[in-house]
C-alpha cells in the first residue's frame, strides 16, 4: 500500500527528489557556509539593540533569528583533558565553532560550551556570555558516604553511592579536588550554590542546611549536626554475607544464578533494614556554607523550578553524580532542569558509575558524549569571568 501510494503521485515524488537534492547541495557546499564568520551575532528581530564589545545584546523579551553558521576548527585539541585521571578526553575529528546561543545583557561570566550533532558530522562549540547573578550552580547527590559524617558502606557486602568503599573514596577525592574549588570560586558571584539529596525535607537536615523555606540559625545548625551524627552513628551497618550456595534449575541455570546473586543488590539483605531511611548529609569533601541550599528529592521538581524562577535564575551550571543516573534523572537532574533553564553540564565536575573498572574515565566520557546530543557541555576551565584571559585548555580547544 505504501509503495502504491508513493508511485501514484509522480509530482510528489519529484518534489521529494528536489528536496533531497537541495539538502544534499547544502551539505556538499557546506564549505561556503563554514566560510562565514562563526562569531557573527544572531540577527535580532527588532533593530537598534544595544551592543557590548561589538556584539548586539538582546532584550530579555526579544526573539531573534539565530545564524546557524559553522566554521571548521583547524587542528582541534581534545576536549575535557584537564583531569585525565577522572575523565578520558574526548577526541572527535569534526569540530566547528558557531555563534553564541546566550549573550545576556551585562553578562559577566563566559561559558564556552559544545554539543554533538550527527547531522553536522561533528562537535559544535560556541562561546556564551551569561549573568552570574542569574545563575545557579547545582551539585547533584554529593552523598556523605564513608566520610567524617559516619554514614558508612554496610559490611561485609553492602553497597551505596559508587557501591564500594574504594570507589566512594575516589569520588570523594574528585569532589575535593575538582568540584569544591569550582564552588568556592563562584559562590560569591552566582545566585545560589545548591546540592540535591535523596529523601524528604526531614526535621534533622532542615536544621543543618538551608532549604527552600528555611534558613537555620547557627544554634539550629549546631544542634542539627549533633542529632545527625548521632542518628548515623546509632545505625548497625552490618548486612548478610554473600550466599555460599545457590539453587540452579536444569533449564535456565544462568537466569537462576543471576536471580539469586545479582551484580547489584542495595536492599536490606546486604545493607540492613533502615539503611536508606537514614538522613544523608552533604559530603565533607565540600566546604558547605550557611547560604548554600539543599534540594530534597522527595519534594519533586516543581518546588525547585519555582524557587529558581522566583529568584530570577535563568542558567544552571550542573555538577555532581552519577553522570549516567542521578545526574540526569533525579529531581535536580538535567532532564528536568533543561525544560525550564539554560543548562550547562560541567562535565569534568561529574563522574559516572564504573562497574568492572578501576577508573571512571571511560564511563563518564561515554555518558557525557551521549548527553551531548541534546545538552550543552562545558568544563571547569571554560567557565571564567568576562575579561579574564582564556585558560590554556580553552584557547587550545578553540584554536583555528
Predicted regions and their residues:
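Bacterial N-terminal signal peptides
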Residues: 19-31
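The substrate-binding groove and active-site-proximal loops of carbohydrate-active enzymes
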Residues: 165-173
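Long, intrinsically disordered low-complexity tandem-repeat segments
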Residues: 43-58
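Active-site-adjacent betaalpha module
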Residues: 59-137, 142-161, 165, 180-189, ...
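Boundary at the C-terminal end of the N-terminal hydrophobic targeting segment
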Residues: 33-37
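N-terminal secretory signal peptides that target proteins for export/translocation
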Residues: 1-16
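Short beta-strand segments at enzyme active-site cores
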Residues: 192-197
Amino acid at each position: 500500500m505504501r509503495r502504491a501510494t508513493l508511485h501514484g503521485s509522480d509530482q510528489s515524488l519529484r518534489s521529494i527528489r528536489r528536496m533531497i537534492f537541495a539538502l544534499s547541495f547544502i551539505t556538499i557546499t557546506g564549505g561556503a557556509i563554514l566560510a562565514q564568520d562563526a562569531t557573527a551575532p544572531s540577527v535580532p528581530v527588532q533593530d537598534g539593540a544595544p551592543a557590548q564589545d561589538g556584539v548586539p545584546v538582546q532584550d530579555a523579551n526579544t526573539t531573534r533569528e539565530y545564524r546557524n553558521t559553522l566554521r571548521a576548527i583547524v587542528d582541534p585539541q581534545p576536549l575535557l583533558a584537564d583531569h585525565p585521571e577522572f575523565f578520558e578526553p574526548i577526541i572527535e575529528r569534526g569540530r566547528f565553532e558557531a555563534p553564541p546561543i546566550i549573550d545576556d545583557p551585562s553578562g559577566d561570566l563566559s561559558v564556552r560550551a559544545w554539543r554533538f550533532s550527527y547531522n553536522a558530522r561533528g562537535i559544535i562549540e560556541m562561546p556564551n556570555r551569561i549573568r552570574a547573578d542569574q545563575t545557579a550552580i547545582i551539585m547533584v547527590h554529593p552523598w556523605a558516604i564513608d566520610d567524617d559524617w559516619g554514614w558508612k558502606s554496610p559490611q561485609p557486602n553492602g553497597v551505596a553511592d559508587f557501591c564500594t568503599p574504594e570507589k566512594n573514596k575516589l569520588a570523594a577525592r574528585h569532589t575535593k579536588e575538582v568540584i569544591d574549588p569550582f564552588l568556592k570560586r563562584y559562590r560569591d558571584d552566582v545566585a545560589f550554590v545548591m546540592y540535591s539529596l535523596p529523601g524528604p525535607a526531614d526535621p534533622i537536615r532542615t536544621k543543618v542546611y538551608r532549604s527552600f523555606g528555611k534558613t537555620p540559625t547557627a544554634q539550629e545548625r549546631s544542634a542539627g549536626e549533633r542529632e545527625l551524627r548521632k542518628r548515623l552513628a546509632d545505625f548497625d551497618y552490618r548486612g548478610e554475607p554473600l550466599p555460599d550456595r545457590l539453587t540452579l534449575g536444569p533449564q535456565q541455570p544462568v537466569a537462576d544464578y543471576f536471580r539469586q546473586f545479582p551484580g547489584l543488590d542495595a536492599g536490606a539483605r546486604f545493607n540492613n533494614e533502615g539503611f536508606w531511611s537514614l538522613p544523608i548529609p552533604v559530603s565533607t569533601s565540600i566546604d558547605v556554607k550557611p547560604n548554600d541550599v539543599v534540594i530534597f528529592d522527595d519534594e519533586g521538581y516543581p518546588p525547585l523550578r519555582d524557587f529558581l524562577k522566583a529568584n530570577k535564575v535563568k542558567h544552571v551550571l550542573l555538577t555532581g553524580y552519577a553522570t549516567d543516573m542521578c545526574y540526569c534523572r533525579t529531581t535536580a537532574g538535567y532532564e528536568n532542569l533543561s525544560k525550564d533553564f539554560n543548562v550547562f553540564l560541567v562535565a569534568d565536575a561529574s563522574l559516572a558509575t564504573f562497574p568492572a573498572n578501576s577508573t571512571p574515565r571511560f564511563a563518564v566520557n561515554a555518558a557525557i558524549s551521549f548527553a551531548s546530543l541534546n545538552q550543552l557541555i562545558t568544563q571547569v576551565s571554560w567557565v571564567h569571568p568576562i575579561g579574564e584571559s582564556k585558560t590554556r585548555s580553552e584557547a587550545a580547544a578553540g584554536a583555528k
